Amino acid sequence: MTDYAISKKSKRSLWIPILVFITLAACASAGYSYWHSHQVAADDKAQQRVVPSPVFYALDTFTVNLGDADRVLYIGITLRLKDEATRSRLSEYLPEVRSRLLLLFSRQDAAVLATEEGKKNLIAEIKTTLSTPLVAGQPKQDVTDVLYTAFILR
């Protein structure tokens, strides 16, 4: 063999591993890009979960004489409910709901309600009072939160 033939063969053998390496690098890059784009799409879908809009039910304000002499509670509340079915049940039985709440409010002590802890306890009591079924055979009402819209002690 001549020197020219040997150098041509060595150049060819040098190019083959380089081309194989470039091909593997291109395939790896394409695979990573494909995997990464699907990961981003999956993360976007997780973030785009539809958050249900809150269901609120505003009640008219209550004016109640407290157990203390000459003390009056003026209170307005809005209920945050789990779903529209609960809202329609509460609306259908509104006189029963208001009666339960009036009885609950009239049993309160003004000194206790003046504190933040007393107001938080009242929220828990409202949830408990309204969670019991309005009529036998109905499911419990799911009141997730009680929001004060007016609160005056006189």
From Swiss-Prot:
It is a single-pass membrane protein. The chain crosses the membrane at residues 13-35. One of its GO terms (molecular function) is identical protein binding. The keyword Isomerase does not apply. The keyword NAD does not apply. InterPro entries: FliL. One of its GO terms (cellular component) is plasma membrane. Keywords: Cell inner membrane, Cell membrane, Chemotaxis, Flagellar rotation, Membrane, Transmembrane, Transmembrane helix. Its main location: membrane. GO terms for biological process: bacterial-type flagellum-dependent swarming motility; chemotaxis. It is found in: Cell inner membrane. It comes from the Bacteria. PANTHER family: FLAGELLAR PROTEIN FLIL. Belongs to the FliL family. Controls the rotational direction of flagella during chemotaxis. This is Flagellar protein FliL. It comes from Escherichia coli (strain K12).
